[in-house]
Amino acid sequence: MVAHKKSKKKSKKQHGSAGEKELHESKIHAEIIDDEAEYPTSRVIKRAPNGDVIVESLPEEESLDRSELNQDHRSGSSSSSTNSGGVTNTADCNADADNEEVEDTKWPIKLDTHWESLSLEERRNILRISKDELFDMIKSYKNMHNCDCSMCGRHNNLNIEQEIEQIYCELYDSAREEDSDTDFVQFHLKLIKEYQNGSNNTHHHMRHHGDKQDSNICHENFAHNDNDDNNDSTNKNAFLSSILPKEKNASTSENECTNDFLDSLSEDSAIKYCLSEGAIGLDKSYQVDFLGKEEVDSNMDTIPNSDNKTQTALDWKHEIEQFKSSKQKQVSESTTGKEALPPINDIDNTNEVIPEHDEFDSKLLHFAKTVVSSHPHIAEEFINRAMMYPHIKAITEDMMNNEGEGLKRAMESLVLQQELQDWRENMAVSIEKKIYEMDPTEPVIDVSESDSHENERVNGPANALEENNKKDVIESDSLDRPSLVDNNKVDSLIDSIPFKFVKDPKAVASLKNAFYDIFTNKTRRSEIDQDDKEYKEELERLRNEISADEDQASYEWSNDEYEESNDHDEDAEGYVDDECIDDHHLDSGYDDENEDEDIIYDDLHENVKLNEDPSAVPNGHTQLIHHDNSVTSNVSEDGIDDNYDSELDHAERLEEGRRLIQIAITKLLQKKLIASYQEKEAEKNRERLLMELEAEENQKKEKEKKKLKKKEKEKEKKRQQQLAKEEEKKRQEEEEIRLKKEAEEKEIARREAQRKKVEEAKRKNDEKRKKKLAEQRRREEEQERIRKEKEEQKRQREEEQKQKKMEKERKQREFEEQRLLKKKEAEQLQKLKENQKLNEKSMQKNQDTTTEGVPYGSVSTNPLQNNSTLNDDIFNMINEVSKSLSSSPSRNQNDLLGSSVLSNVDHQGGLNAGNVFIPPSLSMSEMSPHAQAGFNTLGSSLQPNLLNGWDQQSSTQAYYHANQPSSSEAPGLLPLSHGGSSSKFSSFADTTVDVTDDVNNLTSFLKDTTINDISLGSTSSIPAQNLDPVNMAPRPQSAVYNQPNLWNNDPNQRLSNFGQQHVQQNPISSSHSQPRRSIWDTGAENTFGVASANNFASNIWDTPTSTPALPNTLLSSQVAATSVDSYEEVLAKTYKMLSPDNSFVPLDKLYQTSLTQINAKSVLSYPQFISTLVSMKNSYNTELLNDNTGLLAYCRMGSVPVPSGLPSYNRQNTFPHATTQVQSDSQQINSVSTPISNPLPQPSSVFNDVHYNQTATTSPANHGNPIPGPTSTIASDPSNFVNFGQSYPNSYQTGNIWS
């Protein structure tokens, strides 16, 4: 509010309206002008309503006594002092008066707030009143007043205290009889409650009877007071408002009223003229108590809502004009209202006389409107009661909307229901009582009139009452003296209404009061005059203010002044809400103690102003006394008997005592409440003082802090300035340094750029120079490459020419050698033919002879054995070559034996003939072309049918590695194949021997032989059955002449040599026979004693099974110079010479020594030597021993008999692996289908007596098909064969070169 007015003040200054500023400012709270100054402890600066500044000292106590305030106000003393602006004392007095009025209106609010703030225990402490406290209060109350009324003791000789004590005891005993648990506190609370209820009843009684007395009685009662008429009217209004039910409180209950309900009231045409902002207060709980929640909700739903609360505030100008017009029409409206009474009084006679409804309703409606709207107090009370009891509002709405049809029907039904006799009795009693209590100054009603009136009642009470009312209205000159009969009639009419449609009895009483006010329109001249006076003063002041602020703040001013205009009504309305709250608490189910607390608290407000002003207390007391005992006072003044007991009976005295006790209790409670309020206010003042002191201390500290902060800020500012200077200086220095660095960096960058330019130019020059050098170097390299290519091409051409030349020479040489070989072969063939003839002859001679003791058995005769001479020559040639290879015969023997053992191991270890290796140094490819040509010529010069035993192509070329190059035999051996075919067993040649010389010697030796002496005959003419079975039997392959170290006794050397062998084969397309490895080669592919499936001959003496065998002339079985017997003798003599003690002699030594004893050395070969030793077993007891490798190494002859002798070489002692190996070999050889016969005849030689004791087996390819022919013949005589697979013990074994 203050800020809003300040803004208006500023706007006024801008417009230059300085004169309007003083009128616009109204009440403004005191405020401190200088906020920065220290808080004043003894005074405060305020601003007056006219805008002047005043200075006042702080009040020491806010709760000053009202008497002091009144004295100060009357004396005109003010606590303000003028300021420099020249403020006058008149302004101070006006401000004090305004403050005093505000304080008077704030007292009930303060007490209400204080009572609500108290706790339950504090309320109980206030309500706890003992008997002693009560009587002390009565004594002090009597001593304070020197009144001679009946309550205070009109006779001094009477002991009023004792009488009151007796009354108190009687009342307490009666209360104890009702409730035995009642104590003094509960008794006092009940008295207060009864006082509350009795005050309402007294108010109703006074409204019906007391106020209808002569006005002189009221003036006499008012003459008992010492104050002026204004105080009398104020006290009267205060007393009336204290005993009336109070529905409104300006500070508390008004906030609880709903705006919607107020807006709905403002829309009603009956009460909208009397509606004021803040004068209407409604609590919904009151309606709930009287009507129930559902009915209240239904009533509230029918109330229209109003969105604008400001519509309830009327324009003041219009209100003033309306007020004036209402005053002028008051008399006429009251007269009109009285004329409307007879129709209401005729309600009981509705069955007899029924008036016009339209006329009656219109008159009643007009009467209600005018009465309610004409007088402010009636309208205000009617509004309050309408809000408290919604049925009144409903009746009013029915009168407004339905023209009173519902009310009329209700009244008629209620009146007709009442019994006529009860109505008569009540009317008679009321009339007698009114006549008795009538003022003597009033005219006395005659007995005849009363009798007639009584008779009229019997006959037609309504008609009589209507006639009396009309008569009284006509005779009355003014509203000041209404007729007693009329009042009695109205009272009797109102009392006759039962109001059964209202549940609450209080509501019934309120309705009766409302109807009484409406029908009687009793006189309130004094109140109206007082209101007129106040309204005139307010009106004058409002006119001045409206004229001043008409254009600026009319709305604000109207609200403020409207609140001030209602201040005079707060005495009558201040506690309405409190008593309503009390009624609510009484009816809402609180406990008795809480109900009593609220009732007593409501009663305390009745005498608030009496305590505020000590001078008003006796006035109020006498007012109450005279109101309660007005009839008694009048009687005493008129000369009635002074005896108190005779005047009042015991019941009246008891009632008076009850009232006095109730008043005393109320005063006592009021005193306690005020004391509690003062204590609380004192506590608040102390707290506020402490808070102010604390605030002052805090303010001082805050100032000190501000000073310190200011100093710190200054210091900080200086420090910041100093830092800024230093920072600026530092920044300048850094700027200089930065500029220097930038200059240096620019210089460095310039130099770097210049250096880069120089380097770039140098780099470009270097690149150019390097490119030139690279180009020159590339050209030189290209020239050098071209030169080298030319030289390389030239060298290649030269090499090609040289190779061509060499090849040409080689071909020429080979051609020459082949020519020579052919020539030699032709010569040899001629010799062979000749030798064959000789051998045939020798074979025929020796065909029937057998050598006993030789295990070879007999040899069948063969007509083709005439080539023995040729065989002997060839055998001698081989012996010569063997001698030339090694000087030690034992070495050859050991090699031969090792070869046979290794062959046997090869068969046991899963090896075959194809896995045999020979040293590469001994291959035929490394032989000289001349030697190879000699061998090739020798083989090619023979006829195919005659050279089958020398050169047979194997059927399984893949098995013997046919893709490998051919190899040649060792020097000193016969060529084993034609055209470079390989041998199965390679010779272990000594690397120290010159192979070329040996081959040349062998070639020259063969030239000298008589190989061409062989006579060739037709092989087809020879029958197959004439073949020698020995020749047909297969023989194991031997490598005797393929091993140069035959007499080497070292088994490790033999094994190592055997592991280094390798076979290379080069098949010849023109030949289909397997080449022979030696003259004893029978082919490893065939089984011993079984004819080959590919028509291989078993040896050089055998022939294939498919063709007649031609006699082989390789060796002869007889030597021309020496016989077998001579060999045995030579060997025996040699043994005796070497071992006189009959010990074992090495075989090689024996063989070498025996050769020296024989003339023809070429005749005795090592195999013959072994055969001879074997044949000497029986004749000379020969014992042969094997070495660690299983070869024959030692021999012993002599008288020592052989314990077991040599094992019989039968077919049971066969080698276990021979058959398996032969079968695997036979399986591969059988693939060859072309039979090739051997044209050579079988010679008779030293090997002719050797027969293989092998059983003929079939190959896997011919399983189940045994080969016919000689196989059966061989198997038929097992005694003629030697078991070469026999394993001999280490102590004694007999073997040969194949074992």
UniProtKB/Swiss-Prot annotation:
The UniProt annotation puts the region (Disordered) at 1-104, 200-237, 324-347, 446-486, 543-573, 694-816, 834-868, 960-981
**Which GO CC terms are listed, alphabetically?**
cytoplasm
Q: Which residues form a coiled coil?
A: 675-847
Name one matching Pfam family.
NST1
Low complexity composition-biased segments: 76-90, 971-981
UniProt biased composition (Polar residues): 325-337, 844-868, 960-969
Primary location group:
cytoplasm
Localization annotation: Cytoplasm
Q: Is Cytoplasm one of the keywords? A: yes
What's its job?
A: May act as a negative regulator of salt tolerance.
The protein's name: Stress response protein NST1
Name the species this protein comes from: Kluyveromyces lactis (strain ATCC 8585 / CBS 2359 / DSM 70799 / NBRC 1267 / NRRL Y-1140 / WM37)
Q: Which gene encodes it?
A: NST1
